[in-house]
UniProtKB/Swiss-Prot annotation:
The gene is elp6. Component of the elongator complex which is required for multiple tRNA modifications, including mcm5U (5-methoxycarbonylmethyl uridine), mcm5s2U (5-methoxycarbonylmethyl-2-thiouridine), and ncm5U (5-carbamoylmethyl uridine). The elongator complex catalyzes formation of carboxymethyluridine in the wobble base at position 34 in tRNAs. Keywords: Cytoplasm, Nucleus, tRNA processing. This is Elongator complex protein 6. The keyword ATP-binding does not apply. InterPro entries: ELP6 (IPR018627), P-loop_NTPase (IPR027417).
Length: 265
C-alpha cells in the first residue's frame, strides 16, 4: 500500500470504516495503482477480500503486491483472499466442457446471455460470515467493470449487480465494496458513461485519477481527485474535490499539491 495515500484519506490499517462503497475511476491515464493500493491495504488490515480480476492474471497482481509487501499466494492459502481470475475463467468458458462451465463458472452468464446472478452468488458465498474465522470485515474489489460492458453485458445488468453486491456486502455483511470504472472519454460509449455516473451518485468516496491536460511529464504522472461523502452529504454536486498531483515509482507513489513537485521547486 502507499502510506501517503492513506494519509490523504485519513485512514490506517487499525481504523477501518465499514459499510462503504468506494468508486475508483480514471481518465486519460491508468488508475490501476489505486486497485493495487486498496488490495494490499485491506489484506494488511486483516480483512477477508474477494478480488474479481477481469483485466490481469493472478501472477501480475501478485508481483505488484510483493513490491508493496503483501504475498497474495500466502493470503489465498490461508483463506484470507478469494481470487477470481477472469482471464482463466474466460478461457475455460470458451474452450472447456460446456455443461461443466455453465454449472461452476461464475462468468457463465457471458455465454448464456443472462444476468450476473452467477457472479453475485460467487461473491456472496466467498464473503459470507462463518463462525471462528479470524478475519475482519469482508471486502469486495472489482477490477474492472468496464470490461463487462465491453463483453456485451448491459449497463442495467451491471448496475443491478452492483446494487445487490452493495446491499449484501456493505449492509448485510457490514463490509466494503470497491470497483474501478474507466472514464467515459476512455471508452467512448454511452453504456460506460451511464454506469460511471450512476455509481458516482451512489458512492461514499470517489478517487479519480486523471492525466495531465498539458501532456506527458516525467516528474508528474497525473492528478488525483478525492471526492468524499457523495452519498451521505446529499449534495453531490457541491462537494469540493481535493486535488493532488502524483508520481508513480517502483514501490511508491508520491503525492503533492499542484505545482509543488520536486522538479518545479
Amino acid at each position: 500500500m502507499f502510506p501517503e495515500l492513506n494519509s490523504l484519506l485519513g485512514v490506517t490499517t487499525d481504523t477501518l470504516t465499514l459499510g462503504k462503497f468506494t468508486l475508483l475511476c480514471d481518465s486519460n491515464t491508468d488508475g490501476s495503482f489505486l486497485v493495487h493500493h486498496f488490495l494490499s491495504y485491506y489484506l494488511r488490515a486483516g480483512c477477508r477480500v474477494c478480488f474479481v480480476a477481469l483485466v490481469q492474471s493472478f501472477s501480475h497482481y501478485n508481483i505488484v503486491a510483493q513490491k508493496l509487501g503483501v504475498n497474495l499466494s500466502s493470503a489465498k492459502d490461508e483463506g484470507q483472499l478469494v481470487f477470481l481470475e477472469g482471464l482463466k475463467s474466460y478461457t475455460d468458458l470458451l474452450f472447456g466442457d460446456k455443461s461443466e462451465a455453465e454449472e461452476t463458472n461464475p462468468l457463465c452468464f457471458l455465454r448464456a446471455g443472462s444476468d450476473l446472478r452467477p457472479l453475485y452468488s460467487f461473491v456472496s458465498a466467498a464473503l459470507a460470515p462463518s463462525a471462528g474465522q479470524p478475519w475482519k470485515c469482508p471486502v469486495l474489489i472489482l477490477d474492472d467493470l468496464s470490461v463487462l460492458l465491453s463483453l456485451g453485458v448491459t449497463s442495467l445488468q451491471v448496475l443491478d449487480f452492483m446494487h445487490y453486491c452493495r446491499a449484501t456486502v456493505c449492509t448485510q455483511y457490514k463490509g466494503n465494496v470497491l470497483c474501478l470504472v474507466h472514464g467515459a472519454e476512455e471508452s467512448g460509449d454511452e453504456e460506460n458513461e451511464l454506469v460511471l455516473r450512476s455509481l458516482s451518485h451512489q458512492s461514499h468516496l470517489i478517487l479519480q485519477a486523471e492525466g495531465l491536460s498539458t501532456g506527458f511529464c516525467k516528474d508528474v504522472h497525473g492528478q488525483l481527485k478525492i471526492i468524499r461523502g457523495a452519498v451521505s452529504s446529499g449534495k453531490r454536486g457541491k462537494n469540493q474535490p481535493e486535488i493532488y498531483q502524483y508520481k508513480i515509482q517502483d514501490k511508491h507513489v508520491a503525492f503533492f499539491a499542484r505545482g509543488l513537485s520536486a522538479a518545479v521547486l
